[in-house]
Curated annotation (Swiss-Prot):
Protein name as catalogued: DNA-binding protein NEQ150
Entries under Pfam families matching the protein: dsDNA_bind (PF01984)
GO molecular function per UniProt: DNA binding
Entries under InterPro entries matching the protein: PDCD5-like (IPR002836), PDCD5-like_sf (IPR036883)
Length: 97
């Protein structure tokens, strides 16, 4: 690989990251209009602790708000997040011969 190819790849990566960041900002601005201050605070805490989960939660919230544009309070957000990120218990089976 020569220097020019490396630059092109890096430039493409930067463009993709910028597009993703803009989409995330747009989602965030749309969703935040429908959240109470407590729900916003909870979502920001998730953003700091788990950025991947934050992005997923934003996408889900956006879809929910599109279907039923109502104000989402903290308890509703908690319920939604609990369903979204519930831990799955591994099922262990014992097979006896």
């Amino acid at each position: 690989m020569d220097l020019e190819e490396i630059r092109k790849k890096k430039l493409e990566e930067l463009k993709k990251e910028e597009a993703k960041r803009k989409l995330l900002e747009q989602l965030e601005s749309n969703v935040m209009q429908y959240l109470t201050s407590e729900a916003k605070q909870r979502l920001y805490n998730i953003k700091m602790a788990h950025p991947e989960k934050y992005e997923l939660a934003l996408q889900i919230l956006y879809r929910v708000i599109q279907q039923t544009p109502t104000i989402i309070d903290d308890t509703t957000l908690k319920k939604l997040l609990a369903k979204l990120f519930q831990k799955r218990e591994p099922k262990i089976r014992f097979i006896r011969k």
